[in-house]
């Protein structure tokens, strides 16, 4: 009997250690993704100084919020005087709900890998210097409520994949260089037209007919 109890205790201890190691590996994976972002950014005000890759758990870093399972759920770096570009590794933060990088001077494109963030609720990249298209992959973000990309230099059409996100409540793509027509179906039926203003090549709403450059919108 004592031998059986000992084996059970040994099994329980081994299971606990295994689960702890799994959480450790997951935390390190998320830390690697965040550190890739740090390396891709210029940070003159040292707001990312606590993002130390030698620390096991990124939940101890400033501007990072985690849930009770020590999984990263928020990155809050709005108005932080950051420049550089967005790292595609951000797409590995599978529990991320809020990505707040507004009012910086971030350049380059929006990584298509952000479409892997299946739990994302808010994507705030407004008031930066982003270029390129709005990735079609963002249409996979079925939990997304807030999408604010205004005041950048984005080009191309508004992806129709975004109209299939039932949770989407706020879309703002004003003050870019988007082209084509403004969607009106799905959640876009309730988005005010002012959220599309200051895109000289954007026509809409699309129910008024296709713009002459709809088939050649880049």
From Swiss-Prot:
GO biological processes: defense response; signal transduction
LRR repeat extents: 94-117, 119-140, 141-165, 167-190
Record's note on what induces expression: Up-regulated by methyl jasmonate.
This protein's UniProt keywords: Leucine-rich repeat, Plant defense, Repeat, Signal
Pfam annotation, one family: LRR_14
UniProt cross-references to InterPro entries, sorted A to Z: LRR_dom_sf (IPR032675), LRR_N_plant-typ (IPR013210), LRR_R13L4/SHOC2-like (IPR055414)
Transmembrane segments: none
Signal peptide coordinates: 1-27
Role this protein plays: Involved in plant defense response.
Subunit structure: Interacts with HIR1.
Protein's UniProt name: Leucine-rich repeat protein 1
Organism: Arabidopsis thaliana (Mouse-ear cress)
């Amino acid at each position: 009997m004592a031998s059986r109890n000992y084996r059970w205790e040994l099994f329980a201890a081994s299971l606990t250690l295994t689960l702890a190691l799994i959480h450790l590996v997951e935390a390190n994976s998320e830390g690697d993704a965040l550190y890739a972002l740090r390396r891709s950014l210029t940070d003159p005000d040292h707001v990312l100084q606590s993002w130390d890759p030698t620390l096991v758990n990124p939940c101890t870093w400033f501007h990072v919020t985690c849930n009770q399972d020590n999984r990263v759920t928020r990155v809050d770096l709005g108005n932080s005087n950051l420049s550089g570009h967005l790292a595609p590794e951000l797409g590995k933060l599978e529990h991320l709900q809020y990505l707040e990088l507004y009012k910086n001077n971030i350049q380059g494109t929006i990584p298509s890998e952000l479409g892997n963030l299946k739990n994302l609720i808010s994507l705030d990249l407004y008031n930066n210097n982003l270029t390129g298209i709005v990735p079609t992959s963002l249409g996979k973000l079925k939990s997304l409520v807030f999408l604010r990309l205004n005041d950048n230099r984005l080009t191309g059409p508004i992806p129709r994949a975004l109209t299939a996100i039932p949770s989407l409540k706020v879309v703002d793509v004003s003050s870019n260089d988007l082209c084509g027509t403004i969607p009106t179906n799905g959640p876009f039926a309730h988005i005010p037209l002012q959220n599309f203003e200051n895109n000289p090549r954007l026509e809409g709403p699309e129910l008024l007919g296709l713009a002459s450059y709809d088939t050649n919108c880049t």
